[in-house]
């Protein structure tokens, strides 16, 4: 797998700053696989004029700064980014990682009746379910910026539902 698209947006307080976003296409070093085209809907010609990987990573680092990362199933994305950063600059992301699915699980778990609160609680963690339960709009999935926006909206809503006054930016 290669990084072919990067999407990020900023959260300030309880607001999603959609004007402050990063949306990049990355020129892959290998052919874009049919599986990748099917998932991300980006063809070889769509990313042919993308940035070289190391330039895209530099822009991502500048955009992120020291802020925490918020996302849905971040482990995969962070592993891909860390691999690219290690190759380009010899470093990995030190930022705090905030996993939206874990926040959602904790929130839903507390809503279960006591007899259902056990280690194997049946809580649906699909992104579409999370967004629907939180009454948030579902945008086209597997689009880097859309995924970032939806994860940010879920993060903000979950923080509000948990009664947390300030949201990390």
Listing of model-derived features with the role each one plays in the protein:
Residues 2-4, 10-40, 62-169:
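Metal-dependent phosphoesterase core characteristic of DEDDh/y 3'-5' exonuclease domains
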Residues 38-56:
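Metal-dependent phosphoesterase signature
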Residues 53-65:
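Short, basic/hydrophobic alpha-helical segments
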